[in-house]
Every structure is written in C-alpha cells, then in structure tokens.
From Swiss-Prot:
Domain of life: Bacteria
Keyword Cell membrane: no
Stated family: Belongs to the histone deacetylase family.
Classification via InterPro entries: AcuC, HDAC_PDAC, His_deacetylse, His_deacetylse_dom, His_deacetylse_dom_sf, Ureohydrolase_dom_sf
Keyword presence, Nuclease: no
Stored PANTHER family: HISTONE DEACETYLASE HDAC1 (PTHR10625:SF10), HISTONE DEACETYLASE HDAC1-RELATED (PTHR10625)
A Gene Ontology BP annotation from the UniProt entry: acetoin catabolic process
UniProt keyword terms in alphabetical order: Acetoin catabolism
The protein, known as: Acetoin utilization protein AcuC
Pathway entry: Ketone degradation; acetoin degradation
Amino acid sequence: MQQHSSKTAYVYSDKLLQYRFHDQHPFNQMRLKLTTELLLNANLLSPEQIVQPRIATGDELMLIHKYDYVEAIKHASHGIISEDEAKKYGLNDEENGQFKHMHRHSATIVGGALTLADLIMSGKVLNGCHLGGGLHHAQPGRASGFCIYNDIAITAQYIAKEYNQRVLIIDTDAHHGDGTQWSFYADNHVTTYSIHETGKFLFPGSGHYTERGEDIGYGHTVNVPLEPYTEDASFLECFKLTVEPVVKSFKPDIILSVNGVDIHYRDPLTHLNCTLHSLYEIPYFVKYLADSYTNGKVIMFGGGGYNIWRVVPRAWSHVFLSLIDQPIQSGYLPLEWINKWKHYSSELLPKRWEDRLNDYTYVPRTKEISEKNKKLALHIASWYESTRQ
C-alpha cells in the first residue's frame, strides 16, 4: 500500500447517497460511491482518512438561506407543502423535485463541509475533500439546478464569521456558480471566481464577465465565460491566466474549490470539449495555489458531472490525489472495481486511467474558439489587476 497523508480528510458516508430526487434524475450520488471505492481498491485512500459528515444546524443553514426557505424544505421532506409554496421555493419541477427527508439529507451534505472547515481551522488536518458536496446553484431562498442547500456558500460564510478568515471560492464546473456568486455579491470577505461555459447557451444563463460585484463587493466577483466546444488547451490557458492574479490580489486565508467534471466531452448536459487531461490538471493547479498562497489550506468539493461511469470516478479520484500529493495516475484501473461495477453500469466501463479518445470529435473551429477565449481571459486579467492595485 502506498503511503497516505494524515493531513488530508475525506468526507464519506452512505448517508450522502440519500440525496436523490428520483431514480431517473441525472444527479446521481452513486458517483460518490463509485469514486470512493475506486480510490480504496487502488490503495490510494486509507479508511483512516475518511471522516463522517454531521447534520448542519438550522442556524448554520441560515448563514446563507432564509428562515422561511429552510422551513419549506422541512415541510417538503414530509410531503406537507402546498403547490403555491413549492412553486415559490423552486420545488415544483423535475429539476428540483421533492423527496423524502430532503432536509436532513441536504443538511448532511452541508455538515460534511463544515466538519472539514473545523478540522482545518483547528489545525487537525491541512486540507479536505468533500466530493459529495458542491451544490453551487442553490439560492438563499430558492432551490435551483439540482441544489437544495448551498454547502459551498454556507461553508465560506461559516469560515468568514467563525474564524475571521478571507475565503476564495474557485469554481471550475461547466455551469456558472450562480447561487454562490449572488450570496456574496456585495461582500468583500469572500471572493468568488467561476470559469464556465457561457450562459448564452447553458443553464443558469448568468456568469457574464461584467458581473463583478456591487458596493464593497465590487471586484470580488470574477467570471470567465468560455465558448461552447472549448478544448483542453484553451480551458487550461484561460484558467491559469485569470485565477492566479485573483489569488495574489485577494490574499485569501483558505480556498474552497468546486470541481465539477461536466466540462468533459462525454458529459450529456454541457457543450464543452475537454478531456480527462484538464480534469486531472485543474485540482493540481488549485493545490499549487493553496500551497503557494494559503499555507496549504483548501477544501475541494465535487459539483456537476453526469457521466457517472466513464468520467466522474476517474476525474474525482484525482481531486483527492492532488491533496495527498500523489501523481496523476496511468495504466489499468483495479480489476476488483471493474468486476464489481460492470454488472451495474449502463455502458462499458473504462479499463485505464487515461481517456481512450476513440469517440472524441475535434472541432474545426478550435483556433477561432481558443483565440476568442484568450482575448476575453486577457481582458479579465488586465481589468482585475488594474482595479485591485
């Protein structure tokens, strides 16, 4: 067995799998179990590193969410919410349907993040991984985009208030982290950075580069919208061009990163054209930023990712591996993992850590797309550096 870091905590419990709208819903937390078992089978995760999530309290949830919204979620948990209330709080459609005990299961996701926050801020661990979290669309008073409670925003506010720390949120999910952004739009203790597919063609339709915050929060919101069909080289170039100036200027005490893996070309809900190469590189760069600017303090969350068999387990494994300073993996996946899950998978499981790319489509407009992305990224970096001096 490889040597494991005792300074990294990994949140997992089968209770996290209960956050489930219905059997056919694209948000499927089985991806968390698939990832965890892959790490265990590959001897990359030690059981001693796993910590159990607690249930967040009402006061903790209301660091971000409105009282009436939390009460509505409690009522919906038991099927006692009216149609008008369900509509008001975003609980009346297939996207964010009601399910039994949804308050408790959602609060458990939040509690997992807060558990890591306390462990890190008390010096018991250096960093943490919460792949079951990353629900960045939830608004203070409304469910949205498969998200009930915004665990990232709550954790950021918790750390800012309880520990008087400056928090930077780095969101690389294909969808704009709108719920998190609006929670801190007029705040200067939390900075939000989101690089995502442009909202011109993708939910939630926000995240334009001109969304920069307001009042004392002006300049503390940074958005980098990318063109559809953006490929690896362009995504990574724009990410690195824009994110490090933000870190240097804001000088956070801790980073929270949202590691949605729906930028992958196999993801069914988005239009980006990246591969596992980007998804492996991103968390390692965030880890570099944390080591360089926050004394290593970082919590890495999950996020989007809807190809749960061929993409999420391999990509999310590297989120954890970046935290424990293990190298990017190559070669064959553990046979134990393949042999167990091949009976459940709706498609052929991968055999190797690398993408085969046998079905990858190269886009003729790659150069045009990349040039447009870079031009915007340079503009954003220049604007940010000039306004923060």
